[in-house]
Amino acid sequence: MNKLLPALAAGLVLASCKPAVSPGVAIFESFRYEGRDAVYEAHPLPTKDVVYNPILPGWYSDPSFCSNGEGDYFLVTSTFSYFPGVPLFHSRDLVNWKQVGHVLDRPSQLTGLGRQHTSGGIYAPDIKYNPKNRTYYMITTNVGTGNFLVKTQDPFGAWSEPILLPQVQGIDPSLFFDDDGTAYIVNNDDAPGGKPEYDGHRTIRIVEYDVENDCTIGERKIIVNKGVDPSAKPIWIEGPHLYKIDGKYFLMCAEGGTSDQHSEVVFRADSPMGEYKPWHRNPILTQRHLAADRPVPVTCTGHADIVKTPDGAWWGVFLGCRPTEKGFENLGRETFLLPVRWSEDGFPYFLGGEETVPVLVRVPGTRVEGTPTFGNFVVEDSFDGDKLDMAWMTLRGPADGLYALKGGALELTCSPMRATRFETPALLLRRLQHHAFSASTRMRFAPEGSEAAGLLLYKDERHQYFLKVCLVDGAPAIALERSGETLSSQALPKSFNTVDLCIASDDGLTFRFGYAVDGKEMRTLLASVDASYLSTAVAGGFTGTTVGPYAVK
């Protein structure tokens, strides 16, 4: 059934003023994304103070958030080799989130990104607020250049140029500002002496940070070696965050690797430098022990961060995945929200025993308003502004000169830069956020030679589907390409004005690719196309799938 292949004449927005089609240029008059996951239809929000998990669906991994103590919360996630880097979300209540920009929005902040693979680049950003100097800090890893931080006193405005931290080796740095003004950086690094006893043997290290001079002080110290139970040879202790709560220092870390064995664990000490002792009931969050066939499973949970609200409650965000009934997913690691509980012996935790990550979460005293970031929704972009919507991303750089907003449309210039290479192609991508979805566009394009334009489903350089208008044997055609291999093609009329393109899925298991010429009935080019090809289970990597316009020659 073609439940999500609509007649696009009704669903797509037509530009009132249509610019002429220039040679080598594809004109996209509109783009429409619709999510229809059955889980949301089966679980309607019962009251206005209830939200859906995930609060940020789609590939929003490694979340970190902070509070300024005045009712503002800011949240960031990883972007790897996408540009701009590190989306910045703002909320006043932990429920209504709005993207207000990107922390890394110019090439000078993202040096070394140009030749990295899709899952390289920016790892695990951490955002903190320092009340002593009323400054926000974002610290992160650029796989190409090392660890760095940027800062600002106005998070809605521009952030500083990178401050490099060459003494902080490893990944996943996080800042902590103590009550007395002292600051520290904790992060994941190699085994002691660079000599791991087994694969996945890592450490958490700490170093003091000079806030006035923006540099580290003294030697780094190992505060966790291997993990909670060294005798069990735990792997990938990482993603650390340090907090001071009621006079004690709590170190929260991810452990187990970021796949289905992922977890969150906690340690406690009397001093920032340790000795850190693990809670005897660790992990404080995991789903790895639960039955795979449980209803509405969430897997891979971990990499958490917590904040305190003005009323004294604690809340946390963490990443997780929502697999399909066959166990794979294309959405990537998403951002979830849960209240933090406290044990009788004074440790924070999220879930215990057989508890599962809930679909619905009540946040007392709040009210869902406007257009939420979660649940089922429709996004339409008619490209009639002077700036791109913040959801759009390019790869490795700003793609200057390859796209333009003109006459109420998006123009992409066909480029020899290809999405199958470590380059910056002529494309704009947004996150896939639902298993059941449709992504569609209305395009005007007259291909010449090897030119092609259309919609790209992108996981990485080696895993992608391209629904394109091109020439086949010198005549216009619609074709579906899988990472350079043509799967299907059909002839188009010799003369046409617009082509509507649609990629859809009912359940995240397979894709359907369709098209319509000059607003006529939608036709299916190819259905039942394997969706697992783009999944992390097949392709690997740390990102989810993205979709959007693409032009190449």
Where do the protein language model's features map onto the residues?
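C-terminal motif of bacterial Sec signal peptides marking the signal peptidase cleavage site
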Residues: 15-16
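Sec-dependent signal peptide recognition
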Residues: 2-7
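Carbohydrate-active catalytic/glycan-binding domains of CAZyme proteins
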Residues: 19-553
